Structure formats: structure tokens, C-alpha cells
């Protein structure tokens, strides 16, 4: 953990049990400050994809700590982007709250499905039933969904 990351964790009042978690050994890659839109975009690097609980805690504390200054965004960069089915599916509900994937039609259809993975490679399949408009969703929503997953640290997806 570098000093800047440590200072950020102090500012977020991150609990000791999280800070001592080996999965939470991070660094600040960069911070982009968008003055006009008042958004601070944090790029944080971790050894691997964070568990959903660690990610939610981090995102929440960033949002709260900077709420009087700006909105926050966080992109997780990982050294090891491997994942399993459980980790991938744990992040899926967050996807449906994010821009581009939060439309009622998309969430109503796809929130009932789960990803399957064959191995720890970059292969994940969303098994869906027979949908007449599947091509539309694949073209318009799946690339956005993939980008959101990449922002969570799923670099190999």
C-alpha cells in the first residue's frame, strides 16, 4: 500500500479489519478531477478483483467522504483479473443500477439470469431463454455491461 492510498483510507475512515485484509492492499493509479461536471474519478489498483462487500464499502465511503465536494466514480484496476462464477454473479445486481443498464426493460428481463463460466479464463456466458429481441440487447446493452464489469476490475472479461 502506498502512502497516498493510506491517506485516502484515513480520509475515508476505512475500518482496520478492511485495511488489514490482504485483498485490500491497494494503490492509487490516478485521480481525474472533472471541474465542470464536479466528478472525481479514482483509479485504484488492487492485486485481484475485490469481493462485492469490499467494493461496496469502498464505493460507499468514497461517495460519503467527497459528497460535499463532488460526485465520485471508481475504477478498479487489477493485477490478476481472474474470476469465478460466484464473483461475477455477485456484481451483476450492481450492473442494473448503472447508466446504460438501468432501463426497466433490460433489468426486468435479465436480472433473473446468472452467468456461467467454464474456467477461470475470460469466458463467461449469460444463459437466457428464447428472447425475440435478444439481438437488440446484445448489441445495445452487453457492451455497456462489459465496460461496467471492466470498471469493477474484471479486466479479462
What residue ranges belong to the model's regions?
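Intrinsically disordered, low-complexity basic tails and flexible linkers associated
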Residues: 1-157
Amino acid at each position: 500500500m502506498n502512502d497516498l492510498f493510506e491517506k485516502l483510507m484515513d480520509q475515508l475512515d476505512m475500518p482496520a479489519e478492511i485495511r488489514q485484509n490482504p485483498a485490500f492492499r491497494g494503490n492509487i493509479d490516478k485521480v481525474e478531477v472533472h471541474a465542470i461536471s464536479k466528478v472525481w474519478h479514482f483509479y485504484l489498483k488492487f492485486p485481484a478483483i475485490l469481493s462485492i462487500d469490499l467494493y461496496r464499502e469502498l464505493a460507499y465511503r468514497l461517495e460519503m467522504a467527497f459528497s460535499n465536494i463532488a460526485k465520485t466514480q471508481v475504477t478498479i484496476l487489477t493485477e490478476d483479473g481472474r474470476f469465478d462464477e460466484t464473483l461475477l454473479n455477485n456484481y451483476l445486481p450492481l450492473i442494473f443500477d448503472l447508466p446504460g443498464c438501468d432501463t426497466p426493460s433490460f433489468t426486468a428481463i435479465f436480472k433473473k439470469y446468472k452467468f456461467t463460466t467454464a474456467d477461470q479464463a475470460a469466458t463467461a456466458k449469460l444463459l437466457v431463454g428464447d428472447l425475440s429481441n435478444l439481438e437488440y440487447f446484445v448489441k445495445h446493452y452487453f457492451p455497456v455491461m462489459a465496460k461496467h464489469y471492466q470498471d469493477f476490475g474484471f479486466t479479462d472479461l
